[in-house]
A protein has these predicted regions:
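Zn2+-dependent metallopeptidase catalytic core
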Residues: 154-163, 236-251
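ATP-dependent phospho-/nucleotidyl transfer catalytic cores
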Residues: 202-234, 273-345
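Reverse-transcriptase-like RNA-dependent polymerase core
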Residues: 183, 188-213
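Short, compositionally stereotyped local motifs that mark structural "simplifiers"
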Residues: 5-173, 195
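Short, flexible loop/turn elements at secondary-structure junctions
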Residues: 16, 136-140, 158-160, 175-179, ...
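Extracytoplasmic/secreted proteins, especially bacterial periplasmic and envelope-associated proteins
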Residues: 236, 240, 244, 258, ...
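Short, well-structured beta-strand/strand-turn elements
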Residues: 247-261
Length: 345
């Protein structure tokens, strides 16, 4: 059998206990007999007649409907389902819209398809910097339904400054930031998860000053505390400092950033910047050749904890520094072998 990827919370399973036929199980039962909800494969993913991107005026988008299937679609950024609008003919897109579609095999042999997503920008919605369109259920007010610690599925599309489509991916998202969540342009984290069946990473060179071309995690922020509504903000301080550190080779853990315009479920959400996520094992693998199980990563916010690995070596060093005479050259030289002094200056 050709066992490929599955959608979230699905699995490949034997069609009958001990049988030789494998099928997609949409309601997995680990260590128990497989029940109903078994399918040969997935229905064909819908195909749109027009590419995602910027258009001077409105357009009519047709969707290819495979024989024996029906297509359901949404225009509000939400994931379509069996109760969404039935596709019966070309869809008129008069304003900036996130069009999402799913197909259903009317015979019941195949499970519902993967979701196709295209964002169409029309008329005055054109920009001189790159644009990112994010879409998902319940995100149009800038608040994630799951709240703090809650992950919500998100589709993300990147467009070049000239309006051409660049790359897309599907993953999870959650709220990011602390004080900056007091205003409308909230920050969020995006995480590509291969277990959702779409992508394992955003595969594109997203930053002009770095050659990195695969990203599982990104942070989106509207300048954070340099954008408070109750005091003047430059909107660039943090990004500027990180970029300066990179160009001056200051030996710091810079979060490379890039300015962009964000649209959320088709709504203009303003100027943001997206950044690398430092507490991401892909970050340490890329820049330090230290993959998971080979790095200790500690974080501090109101307390200190180990994000990866162990904190034993760090606490041993802290105890040495706080208990020994650091004016002694030998002690200082020893500590200098355990960390990069320039990164602390």
């Amino acid at each position: 059998s050709n066992i490929g990827t599955t959608q979230a919370d699905h699995s490949w399973a034997r069609d009958t206990d001990g049988g030789s036929i494998w099928a997609i199980c949409t309601n997995p039962t680990p260590e128990a007999s497989n029940g109903a909800d078994m399918f040969s494969s997935y229905a064909m993913t819908p195909v749109f007649s027009d590419e995602a991107g910027f258009y001077a005026g409105g357009l009519n988008v047709a969707i290819n409907v495979p024989v024996g299937h029906e297509v359901r679609y949404t225009t509000d950024g939400y994931a379509p389902n069996a109760g969404s609008m039935l596709y019966t003919g070309a869809i008129n897109v008069a304003t900036t819209t996130v069009l999402r579609a799913i197909s259903f095999d009317l015979s019941g042999v195949n499970a519902p398809s993967y979701i196709a997503t295209n964002t169409y920008f029309t008329g005055a919605d054109s920009h001189t910097i790159s644009v990112v369109s994010v879409s998902g259920n319940g995100q149009e007010d800038g608040e994630w339904p799951g709240g703090w610690g809650g992950d919500e599925p998100m589709h993300i599309e990147f467009f070049n400054a000239n309006g051409s489509f660049r790359v897309e991916a599907t993953g999870d998202s959650n709220e990011h930031g602390n004080d900056s969540n007091a205003y409308g342009q909230r920050g969020f984290d995006y995480v590509t998860r291969d277990q959702m069946g779409y992508d394992y990473a955003i595969e594109a060179q997203l930053f002009a000053i770095k050659d990195r071309n695969k990203f599982q995690r990104l942070i989106f922020k509207a300048a954070a505390n340099d954008n408070y509504p109750f005091e003047p903000g430059a909107h660039i301080r943090d990004s500027y400092v990180h970029t300066l550190s990179h160009k001056a080779d200051l030996k710091l853990d810079e979060r490379t950033s890039e300015s962009c315009i964000v649209y959320l479920n088709g709504l203009y959400w303003g100027v943001y910047d997206y950044r690398e996520k430092v507490d991401d094992i892909d970050f340490t693998t890329k820049y330090y050749d230290q993959p998971r199980h080979f790095v200790d990563f500690l974080k501090t916010w109101g307390g200190t904890w180990e994000e990866y690995g162990s904190g034993n070596d760090w606490y041993t060093l802290v105890n040495f520094v706080t208990s020994q005479d650091m004016t002694d050259a030998a002690n200082y030289d020893y500590v200098a072998t355990q960390l990069h002094p320039l990164s602390l200056i």
